[in-house]
Amino acid sequence: MISVHYLDNSRAHRILWLLEELGLEYDVKVYARGSDMRAPKTLKDVHPLGKSPVIEDGGKIYAESGAIIEYLIDTYGKGALRPKQGTDAYRRYVYWLHYAEGSAMPLLVMKLLFSRIPRQVPFLLRPVATLISKGVASKFINPQLKDNVAFWESELSKDGLFTGGELTGADIAMSFPVEAAMSRVDGVDAQPAIRLYLDTIRARPAYQRALKKGGAYVYAKS
């Protein structure tokens, strides 16, 4: 049976959702974040980097969200959740699957980290740290996030999903960046196509089952 090492309020929710869409049996080991919001050190007993999601299947360890999504669809998908190779939909699928972690998440992580920097320095240095953090956010991070959100809205306006009219692994991969952006980026909740995309995926029975089986996931409330 597949085992999922699930860090609460993390990208691991996507893996549970995918497993539910595929109708696979699995068990979940939930890890709670520490007071510093980091993963517990016990995750390093599973994988050297101590990150989540990580799955175990057939005695092997698989890490990285995109790699796990590809592995599960390749191994158990039976043609589901992935367009036919050689089609335009397949090219879009590959693009968005890699874009989720390669382009979207680095910006969102930087947004989060720079918002926390002032709280991590000595009190007397906080005014300077705040100025630097806000400067980086306003000059670099926020403009790029604005462009990316506009890109999502444009693509989703075509047919409601990222790769066409049917749900794919790329839509599952993109769910976390979009949900995280709802709580970190101003104006995202006013984008109608993005809002419809979230309403659509959250209404899926598999998504709801994943919420019940996993740990805390605050992003489902955005």
Each model region followed by its residue ranges:
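Acidic/histidine-enriched, glycine/proline-rich intrinsically disordered or flexible terminal extensions
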Residues: 132, 214-222
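Short, solvent-exposed turn/loop segments enriched in Gly/Ser/Thr/Pro and often Arg
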Residues: 32, 169, 214
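Residue-level recognition of oxygen-bearing side chains
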Residues: 67, 193, 206
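GST-like fold's C-terminal all-alpha helical module
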Residues: 100-203
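Phosphate-coordinating loops and pocket residues in cytosolic domains that bind phosphorylated ligands
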Residues: 45, 203, 212-213
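GST-like domain detector, emphasizing the conserved glutathione-binding G-site
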Residues: 1-131, 135
